Amino acid sequence: MPVSARGAPDAEHWAWSEQTDKGRVVVLSGPSAVGKSTVVRCLRERVSNLHFSVSATTREPRPDEMDGVDYHFVSPARFQQLIDQGALLEWAEIHGGMHRSGTLAEPVRVAAAAGFPVLIEVDLAGARAVKKAMPEAIAVFLAPPSWEDLEARLVGRGTETPEAIRRRLETARIELAAQDDFDEVVVNRRLESACAELVSLLVGAVSGSA
């Protein structure tokens, strides 16, 4: 699979307007080690009624994972059924086809129709697929302050071999070259500012508004 320098409201004091007709769907993507998971955690803490899209996957759950919370765990046959029914906004084969993962369309559309802000975190290909399926979605690219910063973050993890880091950096170059294809670009210099910019995008979720 598994796009903004603008004024942002005070995320700590923001409250969702009950008059919102339709929630805005934000699709977040970016290279490895740019800080997507940390930013997502921040958004889930700041926006109390945020609907975070939970992917469907055919892989087995890990001991600490809960069905419906971390993933929707489904059988390969059920996943194929979802594909055939057009029930996925995007999907991909992971690790050479060892399993499949994808974004369920119905929960996203139901939440947005009910006026909730929706966040989907996917890779570059996934973001393009979601944007094609939902042109009204806002594709957001989370970018590092610099190439050197991204490289330092990857190396600093200390969890990957030099070869794995090299492959991730090669992929990151491709991803960074595609950032102009996104609707908004948020540079993750500081967590607080990046989170605030994304809150601004999510809470501007009034149907027909810019």
UniProtKB/Swiss-Prot annotation:
InterPro entries associated with the record: GK/Ca_channel_bsu, Guanylate_kin-like_dom, Guanylate_kinase, Guanylate_kinase_CS, P-loop_NTPase
CDD domains the record matches: GMPK
Highest rank taxon of the organism: Bacteria
SMART domains for the chain: GuKc
UniProt xrefs under Gene3D superfamilies: Guanylate Kinase phosphate binding domain (3.30.63.10), P-loop containing nucleotide triphosphate hydrolases (3.40.50.300)
Record field: catalytic activity: GMP + ATP = GDP + ADP
Entry keyword Kinase: yes
Subcellular location: Cytoplasm
Top EC class for this record: transferase
Primary location recorded for the protein, binned into one broad class: cytoplasm
Residues binding ATP: G30, P31, S32, A33, V34, G35, K36, S37
SS bond partners: none
GO molecular function: ATP binding; guanylate kinase activity
Any one annotated GO CC term: cytosol
A Pfam family annotated for this UniProt entry: Guanylate_kin
All copies of domain Guanylate kinase-like, residue ranges: 23-203
UniProt keyword list: ATP-binding, Cytoplasm, Kinase, Nucleotide-binding, Transferase
EC number(s) on file: 2.7.4.8
Entry similarity comment: Belongs to the guanylate kinase family.
Protein purpose: Essential for recycling GMP and indirectly, cGMP.
Protein name stated in the entry: Guanylate kinase
Organism: Mycobacterium leprae (strain TN)
Gene designation per UniProt: gmk
